[in-house]
Swiss-Prot record:
Identification of the protein by name: Trigger factor
GO CC terms, sorted: cytoplasm
Similarity section: Belongs to the FKBP-type PPIase family. Tig subfamily.
Role of this protein: Involved in protein export. Acts as a chaperone by maintaining the newly synthesized protein in an open conformation. Functions as a peptidyl-prolyl cis-trans isomerase.
EC number(s) recorded for this UniProt protein: 5.2.1.8
Family annotation (Pfam families): FKBP_C, Trigger_C, Trigger_N
Subcellular localization, as worded in the UniProt entry: Cytoplasm
Residue stretches making up the PPIase FKBP-type domain: 162-247
Length: 452
């Protein structure tokens, strides 16, 4: 295959390539088989025309467009690979020549990934993380579990924040009832934020049997557009007031909330270990995020093509909607429930698309520079893990994802680990002082440049 690559811009170029006569012949044969079943030629039954008769009657050129559509995708992919370019998006391909019994020549206008110049990605300074678990952390978790296991008991007297009231309510706007504005025997925890702002506050300080006229204004960004920004009156009847009775903090409580322990001390030790694990995981995530952010900041990346931004948005959208569907929610149902649409979701993902693409480009450059590879065993494990995560069989995963795609994900994670493992934790105050100094130096340099 003859392939020529000519760069016309930082992220654009022209790719000229040939499609061999042998490939064209296969494409013509396949195109003929597709059209032959619907052919009407005088003197022949429908679908029983030979290739020779077809060429005599219509000419071989009648198959060229279909044949080109058949052979072009593989020919273009092979040309991209041979040229050693990282093409993105859809190319614009035009024929240069399509002569009979000769190779065909094509010219493609191609968008390619921007050039990445790596800066320092080892030894990135990141804020030091505190993973110590304090007694107050354990106490707070115990309090939370007591709250979760509290018993609601009838309360005499006025309601307070944290109490649960059983109410009937009927809402009106300008004297007219509206859909979803009424309920009977509804249990509402005061201070939970379950209702629109102001509703729960107006029920505090009342007793069972009280009638309360609750007046609120729906938020301007309220999901139901016909209610947004409007004042509503809720005629509310309080039937019961209940307060939380917290369980006693003892061995019995410990066994009730966790059947793997026998004493309160054992529960405390278990909670402390769980909190330690959580803090260490959160610390590792924070270190990784800061280290990668530093590596990206130190790198220089040419302007990112729109095609890469759109590809990223498409990927994010498909992954998000795919997760929804795995939970049994189809896209249209999701849009209805959230009062959104596809365009709004795309706009949301587009906000950070450029940064995501830049980060991925820098990580890919690190993969290449460090010569990171994925072994067959790692690819096999990746398939097993994905099959378990998405409840799919391994064969389906293998048919859906190529080894190259899996290898890419594995090696990018290796690059992330490499950057993280080589990061240096420093005191936050020291790091902030250094960043402030760097910002000041940058500002001074810009001032000098302007005053020249």
């Amino acid at each position: 295959m003859s392939v020529k690559w000519k760069k016309t811009g930082k992220t654009t170029g022209e790719l000229t390539f040939d499609i061999s006569k042998d490939e064209i012949k296969l494409g013509l044969d396949q195109a003929f088989r597709r059209v032959k079943k619907n052919l009407h030629v005088p003197g022949f039954r429908k679908g029983h025309v030979s290739r020779v008769i077809f060429d005599q009657y219509y000419g071989e050129e009648a198959l060229y467009e279909d044949a080109l559509n058949i052979v072009l995708p593989n020919a273009y992919s092979a040309a991209v690979k041979e040229a050693g370019i990282a093409a993105v998006g859809q190319p614009q391909i035009v024929p240069v020549s399509m002569d009979k019994d000769k190779d065909w020549t094509m010219k493609a206008t191609v968008t390619v990934e921007p050039e990445v110049k790596l800066g320092d990605y080892k030894g990135i300074e990141v804020p030091k993380q505190n993973t110590r678990v304090y007694q107050k952390d354990v106490d707070a978790e115990l309090d939370k579990r007591r709250e979760q296991n509290a018993e609601l008991v009838l309360k005499k007297g006025k309601s307070a924040k944290g109490d649960t009231v059983t109410i009937d309510y009927k809402g009106t706007i300008d004297g007219k009832e509206f859909e979803g504005g009424s309920a009977e025997n509804y249990s509402l925890e005061l201070g939970s934020g379950a209702f629109i702002p102001g509703f729960e506050d107006q029920l505090i300080g009342h007793e069972a049997g009280d009638d309360v006229d609750v007046v609120v204004t729906f938020p301007k960004d309220y999901g139901a557009k016909d209610l947004a920004g409007k004042e509503a009156h809720f005629a509310t009847k309080i039937h019961e007031v209940k307060s939380k009775q917290l369980p006693k903090l003892d061995d019995e409580f410990a066994k009730d909330v966790d059947d793997s322990v026998d004493t309160l001390d054992e529960l405390k030790d278990k909670i402390k270990k769980q909190l330690k694990d959580q803090k260490e995981q959160a610390a590792n995530d924070a270190i990784q995020e800061a280290a990668i952010e530093g590596a990206v900041k130190n790198a220089t990346v040419d302007e990112i093509p729109d095609a890469m931004i759109q590809d990223d948005v498409d990927t994010q959208l498909n992954q998000y909607l795919g997760n929804m569907q795995r939970q049994g929610i189809d896209p249209q149902t999701y849009y209805k429930l959230t009062n959104t649409n596809e365009q709004q979701l795309r706009s949301q993902f587009a906000k950070n698309a450029a940064e995501r693409v830049k980060t991925n480009l820098v990580l890919e450059a690190i993969v290449e520079k460090e010569g990171l590879k994925a072994t067959k065993e790692e690819i096999d494990k990746e398939i097993k893990d994905l099959a378990a995560e998405y409840n799919m069989d391994e064969k389906t995963i293998r048919n859906t994802l190529s080894d190259d795609m899996l290898s890419h994900d594995i090696t990018v994670r290796k690059a992330m680990d490499l950057v993280t493992d080589n990061a240096k934790q420093v005191a936050k105050a020291k790091l902030e002082a250094k960043e402030a100094e760097e910002a000041e130096d940058k500002e001074e340099a810009e001032d000098k440049k302007e005053n020249k």
